[in-house]
Amino acid sequence: HEDPRRQRQMCIRDRPSKVEAVKSAISSVGVSGATILDARGFGSTKGHTDSYRGAQYQVDTNPKAMLQVACKDESVNDIIEAVRSVANTNTIGDGKIFITELLDVIRIRTGETGEGAINGEY
């Protein structure tokens, strides 16, 4: 059951090569801003072999991109579908979407809270 007063934070973790496509996809369903972070992670992909000055070595983490989005509860499903439409390759490493309840948002400059602090001018 969707509650229009509830806010969510979505953390979208995927390959760095998918950032622009994901950013465009979430913008198309009304997301007006996101925080994008470079990260490293490990899981099913188990890292990779790299070389430095001719020497091979094992890297046990992979580069990831994280997009953090604050949104209304009612927008979550649209955002999930938008992300999956551009990021799903049906292979290991496609990433994950984490969704948590967001208790509040406060715009530092104005003191505005809630949905008004998520949307609009920065």
Regions found by a protein language model. Name each.
Residues 1-8:
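Single conserved hydrophobic/aromatic residue that forms the stacking wall/gate
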Residues 9-12, 33-35, 65-68, 95-98:
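Structural motif
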Residues 9-49:
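N-terminal first-folded block
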Residues 37-40, 52, 57-62:
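Compact, glycine-rich, soluble single-domain proteins
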Residues 39-47, 96-110:
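Short proline/glycine- and acidic-rich turn/helix-capping motifs at secondary-structure junctions
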Residues 48-53, 106-122:
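Short, low-order "capping/linker" segments at domain edges
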Residues 57-92:
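Mid-chain, well-packed structural core segment of small domains
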